[in-house]
Amino acid sequence: MKMNRRNLGKAGAGGFTLIELMIVVIVIGVLSAIAYPSYQQYVLKSRRGAVKADMVEYAQRAERFHSVNNTYAGYALPFEVSPREGGTVRYNLVFVGDGSSFTITATPDGQQAKDVCGELSVDQANRKTADGELSECW
């Protein structure tokens, strides 16, 4: 059986056309444009959850300090940034306390500043505040 060079490329030739590849690229681009902002909101929310957990833990530590010393003055936060494991700082934490009250405030930093909740705080009576909607932020 003699093969002709003209038939070599046509018999069993497969692959995608340029138009098909461009359609796939466009579909991926559209899906990315829709999904990425939603993903970013979940990332901000998870970082906010981490700092809220830190703030509640530090408030409990401040209460233990108060039960021993009968004052909040002199208590210091074990970590002044979140995440406490290191890495990029997402929140700066500040403790302000006197004899009978305290407030722990978390101020967003860097990319976290885009979070709708903004600054979060908790006090000795477990009153929580936020720059955004309280029910959404706490």
How does the language model describe each region?
Residues 1-16:
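N-terminal leader/signal peptides at the extreme start of proteins
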Residues 2, 67-138:
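Periplasmic/extracellular, small/polar-rich flexible segments of pilin-like filament-forming proteins
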Residues 13, 25, 101:
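Short coil/loop residues immediately preceding or within conserved phosphate-binding loops
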Residues 14, 19-23, 44:
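Internal alpha-helical transmembrane segments of multi-pass membrane proteins, especially GPCRs
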Residues 21-38:
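Alpha-helical hydrophobic helix detector
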Residues 35, 42, 62:
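Conserved alpha-helical elements of the SDR catalytic core
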Residues 40, 44-55:
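Membrane-proximal amphipathic alpha-helices
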Residues 54-69:
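N-terminal alpha-helical signal peptides/signal-anchor transmembrane segments
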